[in-house]
């Protein structure tokens, strides 16, 4: 590990609900000695920095301040949460044109600063914006990671934990594919305490229809939260903290993320949700899950959906 040193610096671009939740999670964990907040609304970044620094006596010493894109020059990690929020009744893919425009104004000044660290992207539609960040930046694919299905997989583990009366962190299960409506639960590889989930479900009389209902509830949970409180932010903010921790502490942790496909699952030239090894160099390698035939079809269909929207979105951006 050559880039990550004892003094670690993170720059957050986008200080909305997700960004500020991520910043608070990072402050709580004491991860990174220097944390910079960048947003077009300068007063908010100053206010958040002042508010967050008041948490440091209870957590760990940290220099938190409002900054500019030039502060990215010596950063280890740049986290992008900036973008138009998802509104009630709106899908993540509906956001593509608005947020591709916003992203195009972010990546260039970050790169122009001399930044050579790792990008972590969370703005929606995250798989498409992660791919666009990779394209706009010219960075190696390993140094651009999406939050992908990290939050969705957490939601699945919460739901399965409730169903089978175990702690969510004892459930080894992944949502895969798009972070969005074409995502799916990879039940064939899921387990609890090394025992296959499908075997446990059969023994406990949990039907395939019930498992499908759990999958649907996970897929639609964001819409439920958005309809009730306007946005989701605590879960994704914590998921971003976990990925950041794996990078900054060089953990070689297997996490659900949005990763570039280079032949895995028969896919190429796309970012999509899968387990992967994350360390100080970024995305070390994809863990290609042994999906069932039905799940493999869902993965392919999800990629097809993403590629069409990605192609149309980038074309529209070029025509502007």
Curated annotation (Swiss-Prot):
Q: What is its EC number?
A: 1.1.1.27
Q: Where in the cell is it found?
A: Cytoplasm
**Main location per UniProt?**
cytoplasm
Which CDD domains is this protein grouped with?
Answer: HicDH_like
Q: Catalyzes what?
A: (S)-lactate + NAD(+) = pyruvate + NADH + H(+)
Extract one GO molecular function annotation from the record.
L-lactate dehydrogenase activity
The transmembrane segments are: none
- Active site: which residues? 179
Q: What superkingdom heads the lineage?
A: Bacteria
Write out the residues that bind NAD(+).
18, 39, 44, 69, 83-84, 105, 122-124, 147
Record flagged with keyword Zinc-finger: no
Q: Name one Pfam family in it.
A: Ldh_1_N
**Which positions in this protein are listed as binding substrate?**
86, 92, 124-127, 152-155, 232
Instruction: Share an example GO biological-process annotation for this protein.
Output: glycolytic process
Q: What does this protein do?
A: Catalyzes the conversion of lactate to pyruvate.
User: Which family does the similarity line name?
Assistant: Belongs to the LDH/MDH superfamily. LDH family.
On assembly, the entry states: Homotetramer.
What protein am I looking at? Answer: L-lactate dehydrogenase
Task: Give the gene symbol.
Answer: ldh
